[in-house]
């Protein structure tokens, strides 16, 4: 969430920056008047409280002196009623301000290319060699069904479209990737986390999923607790420290979190809905970091390298892309996408994102640090990154490591995890 005072004091530049996202933010022009009215109400309330306190003292003094207090009680009651009306008016005023700020996204970083969507993203560099096949490569669905390691038909019978059953070496490959990713990131100083998969409304708001993206998540409607299914490990892991203040010397704090994620994926169509590229339920390893504001962009670059190492060790060809302002996520100031080459698409497709939300999510979640220089509480910066999306990594392995006979060579780094060098 953006800071009200910052927005009001810098309104023209804030709107100009936000409109690089190719949306209109004219509604923010309401904020200066609302902020002024709020300030005026606060002063009136402060004055009335002072008058009410003075009136209460008079009542007490008159009562102690055995004098008639009827008129003073009446005055006190009038002041009480006026105060309640003003407090209610202030509550409505603050709710209107809150509602405006809660639907306003983060400011995009100045380094981002200006654009309308992913077509305007900027390729930074490519890594790895794209394989030249001596045969026509098959897609992951064909390969997996022939090997009987992914079962879409029975998953559809159980749950409907957008789900899969992993079987045999398919299940072992999924599990091996999760363990490999968790092991690698743990060695780099990330603490392992397996959080709850059911999340409350406050947690969803804190990371920016609510209220804007309610249609994209699953809500448990039979619950009295406003529970949601986890849409990404970012949500529960960041909320570990909601309403907390970090002591001096404790930052940065780094987590690697494994969860199953659940998303509606409404509006998805075409080739992306075939197979496991875009599922309602999928496994994901996520990196989260809480850090000092001065270091957040330095740590963003390191987190990118940490995620890249997974692809390098798996020897998968990939590229790094800087998201344009029009493709940038709601809560993020800057995002890199990792895109792996998929032969069936004959192009690079997203396998992970690494982002800096600066203090945007920290404000929504009220996560602060104690600054030892001035002993004041300040908002931390929060980074998150994929480390990686497991299902899409499975796709990349099946397609890039396929053989002409339909078998799959297991990447060398995974062979000890999987207990075999080939899937057949």
Curated annotation (Swiss-Prot):
It is found in: Cytoplasm. ATP binds at residues 263-265, 350-353. GO terms for cellular component: cytoplasm. Coiled coil: none annotated. It catalyses: tRNA(Ser) + L-serine + ATP = L-seryl-tRNA(Ser) + AMP + diphosphate + H(+); tRNA(Sec) + L-serine + ATP = L-seryl-tRNA(Sec) + AMP + diphosphate + H(+). L-serine binds at residues 232-234, 286, 386. Keywords: Aminoacyl-tRNA synthetase, ATP-binding, Cytoplasm, Ligase, Nucleotide-binding, Protein biosynthesis. It is an enzyme of class 6 (ligase). One of its GO terms (molecular function) is ATP binding. Its EC number is 6.1.1.11. Pathway: Aminoacyl-tRNA biosynthesis; selenocysteinyl-tRNA(Sec) biosynthesis; L-seryl-tRNA(Sec) from L-serine and tRNA(Sec): step 1/1. GO terms for biological process: selenocysteine biosynthetic process; seryl-tRNA aminoacylation. InterPro entries: aa-tRNA-synt_IIb, aa-tRNA-synth_II, aa-tRNA-synth_II/BPL/LPL, Ser-tRNA-ligase_type_1, Ser-tRNA-synth_1_N, SerRS_1_N_sf, SerRS_core, tRNA-bd_arm. Signal peptide: none annotated. SUPFAM superfamilies: Class II aaRS and biotin synthetases (SSF55681), tRNA-binding arm (SSF46589). Pfam families: Seryl_tRNA_N, tRNA-synt_2b. Consists of two distinct domains, a catalytic core and a N-terminal extension that is involved in tRNA binding. NCBIfam families: serS. Belongs to the class-II aminoacyl-tRNA synthetase family. Type-1 seryl-tRNA synthetase subfamily. Catalyzes the attachment of serine to tRNA(Ser). Is also able to aminoacylate tRNA(Sec) with serine, to form the misacylated tRNA L-seryl-tRNA(Sec), which will be further converted into selenocysteinyl-tRNA(Sec). This is Serine--tRNA ligase.
């Amino acid at each position: 969430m953006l800071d009200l005072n910052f927005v009001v004091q810098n309104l023209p530049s804030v709107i100009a920056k936000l409109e690089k996202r190719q949306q209109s933010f004219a509604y923010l022009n309401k904020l200066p008047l609302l902020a002024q009215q709020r300030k005026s109400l606060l002063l009136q309330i402060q004055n009335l409280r002072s008058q009410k306190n003075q009136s209460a003292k008079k009542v007490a003094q008159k009562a102690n002196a055995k004098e008639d207090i009827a008129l003073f009680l009446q005055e006190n009651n009038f002041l009480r009623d006026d105060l309640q009306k003003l407090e209610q008016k202030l509550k409505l005023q603050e709710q209107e301000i809150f509602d405006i700020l809660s639907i306003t996204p983060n400011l995009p970083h100045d380094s981002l290319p200006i654009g309308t969507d992913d077509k305007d993203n900027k390729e930074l560099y490519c890594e790895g060699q794209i394989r030249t096949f001596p045969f026509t490569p098959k897609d992951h669905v064909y390969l997996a069904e022939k090997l009987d390691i992914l079962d879409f038909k029975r998953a559809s019978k159980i749950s409907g479209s957008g789900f899969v059953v992993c079987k045999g070496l398919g299940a072992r490959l999924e599990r091996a990737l999760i363990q490999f990713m968790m092991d690698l990131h743990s060695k780099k100083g990330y603490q392992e986390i397996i959080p709850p998969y059911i999340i409350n409304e406050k947690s969803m708001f804190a990371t920016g999923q609510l209220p804007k993206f309610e249609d994209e998540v699953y809500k448990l409607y039979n619950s009295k607790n406003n529970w949601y299914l986890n849409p990404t490990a970012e949500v529960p892991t960041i909320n570990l420290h909601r309403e907390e203040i970090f002591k001096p010397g404790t930052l940065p704090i780094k987590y690697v979190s494994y969860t199953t994620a659940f998303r509606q994926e409404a509006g998805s169509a075409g080739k992306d809905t075939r197979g496991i590229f875009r599922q309602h339920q999928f496994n994901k390893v996520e990196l989260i970091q809480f850090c000092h504001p001065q270091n957040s962009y330095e740590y963003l670059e390191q987190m990118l390298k940490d995620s890249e190492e997974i692809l390098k060790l798996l020897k998968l060809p990939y590229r790094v892309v800087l998201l344009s302002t029009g493709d940038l996520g709601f809560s993020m100031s800057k995002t890199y996408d990792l895109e792996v080459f998929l032969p069936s698409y004959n192009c690079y497709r997203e396998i992970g994102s690494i982002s800096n939300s600066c203090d945007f999510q920290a404000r929504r979640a009220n996560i602060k640090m104690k600054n030892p220089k001035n002993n004041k509480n300040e908002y931390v910066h929060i980074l998150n990154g994929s480390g990686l999306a497991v299902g899409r990594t499975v796709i990349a392995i099946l397609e890039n490591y396929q053989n002409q006979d339909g078998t799959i060579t297991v990447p060398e780094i995974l062979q000890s995890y999987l207990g075999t060098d080939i899937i057949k």
